[in-house]
A protein has these predicted regions:
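Acidic/histidine-rich, surface-exposed loop or edge segments in extracytoplasmic proteins
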Residues: 25-38, 127-128, 198-204, 233-241
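Post-HEXXH active-site segment of zinc metalloproteases
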Residues: 214, 230-251
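Short beta-strand segments of a lipoyl-like beta-sandwich/carrier module
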Residues: 100-103
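Active-site recognition of the HExxH zinc-binding catalytic motif
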Residues: 218-231, 253
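Short alpha-helix capping/helix-loop boundary micro-motifs
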Residues: 105-109
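C-terminal capping/extension segments of zinc metalloprotease domains
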Residues: 17-80, 87-95, 141-142, 148-156, ...
Length: 335
């Protein structure tokens, strides 16, 4: 973890109830009914950016994810029911129902299939949104049900059929997913960047959230590495987060960063550049904690990995990455 000690398939504000987000630039987008307030527009741009960077990481590394490969549709959905004033937000976005397209990867599978930001989603496959039960004290649960259904469809069939509302009536769109490693990327709350084994969540207050794309991708790659290396499962199987093991898993995630970045189309050096920019500003905090190597040591480990990649002429981490020897008795599949 980078922020504290602790899809790009489809996501929503299940835990964090983040503000809605959408794509920028050339992404197909329906005009909101009214201009969005600056705070909402800013968070929408953040969420779209994280979606895009996560998509690049998961799809770029898909051929090396032998244990956790799925397909990505390159979109985020959100549910107005998960927000404090969902009715007002729904009107602002011009939605005809509660579930809408929050963001699209520019040029990604969903956009190529004809989906638009702020499309109203009526059904996922054969599951009608209106038929999903929702408890008043768990209004976030509906978007999780939708997410799970979408992920199951993409895993089983490689496609995601959606029905959306259009002026001429409901339109069924079938999205052909792109092979991807299994991890969702989403905006959460606060100032942390964390991974839980299946998701990468970064808060809008994270100090590096406004860094350049390559450096923010490095942050996401670090958390993504925790998922790919099954660190959460390893801790669960070996008695929790003991300091020595935490230090080694953090080092292992650091070392995998340049491999993941290279396969996503970024310069692997961005991993070292992130720590060189971040470390001096935060050197008295987590980067000098005994559970983590110092930021300058982390740069050295990354530079060694880049040299190894250059010597190999390959970024195939599934074959060439050398795992740390973790001090536990229970092995975990995929490590």
């Amino acid at each position: 973890m980078l922020g504290t000690l602790a899809l790009g398939i489809l996501a929503g504000p299940a835990l964090a109830q983040s503000m809605p987000s959408g794509a920028e630039g050339e992404t197909a987008q329906s005009a909101p009914a009214s201009p969005l307030p600056p705070a909402i527009a800013s968070l929408r741009a953040q969420d779209a950016r994280v979606l895009d960077l996560g998509y690049r990481l998961t799809t770029g590394n898909a051929r090396f994810c032998h244990h956790d490969r799925t397909a990505s549709a390159g979109l985020l959905l959100h549910d107005m029911a998960a927000y404090g004033d969902g009715a007002t937000l729904r009107d602002l976005l011009g939605l005809e129902g509660d579930v809408g397209v929050q963001a699209l990867v520019p040029g990604g599978p969903a956009e190529r299939a004809g989906l638009r930001v702020d499309d109203t989603v009526l059904a996922i496959g054969d599951m009608n949104i209106a038929d999903i039960a929702m408890e008043d004290d768990k209004r976030w649960q509906r978007i999780e049900t939708i997410r799970e259904a979408a992920e199951d469809l993409l895993q089983d069939t490689g496609t995601l059929p959606l029905t959306v509302a259009r002026p001429d009536g409901p339109l069924r769109i079938v999205i052909a997913g792109t092979p991807a490693c299994r991890s969702r990327f989403e905006i959460g709350e606060g100032g942390r960047a964390v991974a839980d084994g299946h998701r990468v969540v970064i808060g809008p207050e994270f100090a590096a959230i406004d860094y350049s794309d390559p450096l923010l991708a490095a942050v996401l790659a670090h958390e993504f590495a925790h998922n790919l290396l099954h660190h959460r499962a390893w801790f669960d199987a070996n008695g929790g987060r003991k300091r020595k093991a935490v230090r080694l898993t953090e080092r292992e995630a650091d070392r995998l960063m340049p491999w993941l970045l290279a396969n996503a189309g970024f310069e692997p050096q961005a991993a070292a550049q992130f720590f060189e920019k971040w470390g001096p500003r935060h050197g008295g905090w987590i980067f000098r904690a005994r559970s983590h190597d110092g930021w300058d040591e982390r740069v050295d480990f990354i530079e060694e990995e880049i040299a190894r990649m250059n010597a190999l002429g390959s970024a195939d981490w599934s074959q060439h990455f050398q795992h740390e020897e973790l001090p536990g008795d229970v092995s975990v599949p995929g490590r």
